[in-house]
């Protein structure tokens, strides 16, 4: 092992609250559509928390940044979700599996972190912590080798990536050149028949605004029941919905089986809130879902996303990650399946796009006219912009 790969330091940070940066960063505003507009969600059954997702603490944990440095001074960096809880796990538990280790031994490090955290982990914040470490390792190895991450995981399979955009304003996004738009469903079962009619009116208005052929997807954010999803999808057939996303709780594989049986010709997607390959086994083996959407920053990092994709490929099930910015772009660039990614309209009104991570990095690529050609910059191609944004975890 050379000095270039031997890990000598692990630094973990949360973000200064004043920083205009973070995982899935949303600029400071009196209101932001992602958290302060009416979006059906698992807490919609409680009147106190129905109107705004910010009311029940979505995103309250915040972000973390992991830096891994080798003996020659090369630093790999990545951001992720989980804030202070995830940062504490990395600093006080996972660092022992990194110091002195060869940074190329990514599978070994991943396995040790996962097995050591089984008594309290397996999903959620713990896997988010593993994801951040994993992504920092890939960035580090790419920088040492002088190659982009996509070259380390199979090379470039396509020159260009296209994007759809998640937004409350599909017509504005269509004008920006994105090939499709995904809208958040406003109402769920707790809003009754009036809510069902309002959902159909909402979708019909957006269909009219973008025309009959522009792909329009619907994000249901774990908010529906089996019977409601079946009814809604049937009633919306004339609107030509491109896919229905995350209609049920991640725990309800049997529910997805029932929905797919009821509407086998419609496209159903899910799994941004599923964790590790173990959470995907039944979805894949039973062919319950048409497109799998792991979040690279939540599911276990790039390493675990590649494992899930390999498993899914045996069943001809496409994998198109949820969000994840450049971490998803490098994955998609290396794959031979779908050549598109998700982008989220992070402006307060959702009509324009901004960097996924705000001002956190220099070098974060953005789509132009809904398209992107990834540069060949080493690692993920990004460097921290300003260390004043960081608060190191002791």
Question: Locations of the language-model features?
Answer:
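Flexible C-terminal active-site loop/helix
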Residues: 2-22, 26-51, 322-394
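Conserved, mostly hydrophobic/aromatic
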Residues: 7, 73, 94, 133, ...
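Metal- or metallocofactor-binding catalytic centers and their adjacent structured scaffolds
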Residues: 38, 52-54, 69-144
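Shared catalytic-loop signature of beta/alpha-barrel
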Residues: 46-47, 240, 251-371, 375
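Short loop/turn motifs at secondary-structure junctions and domain boundaries
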Residues: 56-60
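Hydrophobic faces of well-ordered beta-strands that scaffold small-molecule active sites
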Residues: 78, 159-166, 181-183, 216-220, ...
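Glycine-rich, aromatic-flanked loop segments that form ligand/cofactor-binding clefts
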Residues: 125-128, 134-170
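Metal-dependent enolase-superfamily TIM-barrel catalytic cores that perform enediolate-based chemistry
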Residues: 154-259, 263
């Amino acid at each position: 092992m050379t000095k270039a790969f031997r890990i000598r330091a692990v630094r973990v940070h949360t973000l200064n609250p004043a920083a205009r940066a973070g995982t899935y960063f949303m600029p400071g505003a009196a209101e932001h559509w992602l958290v302060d507009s009416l979006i059906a969600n698992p807490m919609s059954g409680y009147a106190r928390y129905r109107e705004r997702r910010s009311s029940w603490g979505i995103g309250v944990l915040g972000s973390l940044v992991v830096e891994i440095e080798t003996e020659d001074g090369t630093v790999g960096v990545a951001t992720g979700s989980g804030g202070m809880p995830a940062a504490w796990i990395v600093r006080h538990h996972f660092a022992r599996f990194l110091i002195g280790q060869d940074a190329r031994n990514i599978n070994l490090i991943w396995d040790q972190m996962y097995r050591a955290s089984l008594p309290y982990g397996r999903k959620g914040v713990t896997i988010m912590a593993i994801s951040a470490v994993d992504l920092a390792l890939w960035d580090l190895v790419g920088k040492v080798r002088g190659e982009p991450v996509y070259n380390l995981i199979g090379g470039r399979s396509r020159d260009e990536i296209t994007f759809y955009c998640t937004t409350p304003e599909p017509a504005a996004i269509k004008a920006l050149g994105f090939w499709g738009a995904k809208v958040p469903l406003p109402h769920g079962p707790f809003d009754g028949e009036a809510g069902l009619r309002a959902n159909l009116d909402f979708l019909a208005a957006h269909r009219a605004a973008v025309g009959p052929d522009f792909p329009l997807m619907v994000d249901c954010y774990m908010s529906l029941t089996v019977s409601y999803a079946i009814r809604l999808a049937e009633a919306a057939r004339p609107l030509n919905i491109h896919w229905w996303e995350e209609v049920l709780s991640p725990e309800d594989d049997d529910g997805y089986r029932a929905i797919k049986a009821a509407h086998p010709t419609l496209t159903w997607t899910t799994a941004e809130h599923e964790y590790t390959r173990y959470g995907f086994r039944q979805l894949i083996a039973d062919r319950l879902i048409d497109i799998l959407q792991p979040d690279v920053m939540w599911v276990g990092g790039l390493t675990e996303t590649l494992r899930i994709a390999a498993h899914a490929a045996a069943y001809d099930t496409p994998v198109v990650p949820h969000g994840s910015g450049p971490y998803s772009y490098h994955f998609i660039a290396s794959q031979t399946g779908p050549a598109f990614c998700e982008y989220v309209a992070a402006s307060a009104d959702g009509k324009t796009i901004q960097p996924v991570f705000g001002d956190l990095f220099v070098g974060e690529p953005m789509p132009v006219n809904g398209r992107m050609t990834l540069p060949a910059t080493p690692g993920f191609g990004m460097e921290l912009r300003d260390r004043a944004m960081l608060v190191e975890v002791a």
